[in-house]
A protein has these predicted regions:
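Amphipathic alpha-helical interaction modules
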Residues: 18-53
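Short terminal alpha-helical segments
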Residues: 1-26
Length: 83
């Protein structure tokens, strides 16, 4: 289960990183858009594999695309388990 949350955290971090990459967006918008698309698809796949007993707040954050909040939630969960 922790492996799932580690993958989700990585995917969320990647998408947030791409969003924050203003240089890439300005210099190569096509690549920027492709990286956004790829990161979003990865998150969508992970959302579909979300455990049935997932915390309702995490589900809410992911459904609303509250990426920062979802990442904070997942990181807190992993930290609490010593990862």
């Amino acid at each position: 289960m922790d492996e799932y949350y580690a993958q989700l955290a990585e995917a969320l971090q990647e998408r947030l990183s791409v969003i924050a990459d203003h240089t890439l967006r300005t210099e190569n918008p096509v690549v920027h858009l492709e990286r956004l698309r790829s990161a979003s698809e990865r998150i969508e796949k992970l959302k579909m594999a979300l455990p049935r007993n997932a915390d309702p707040m995490l589900v809410h954050y992911l459904e609303r695309s509250s990426l920062n909040k979802a990442l904070e939630f997942v990181e807190h969960r992993l930290d609490a388990r010593g990862h």
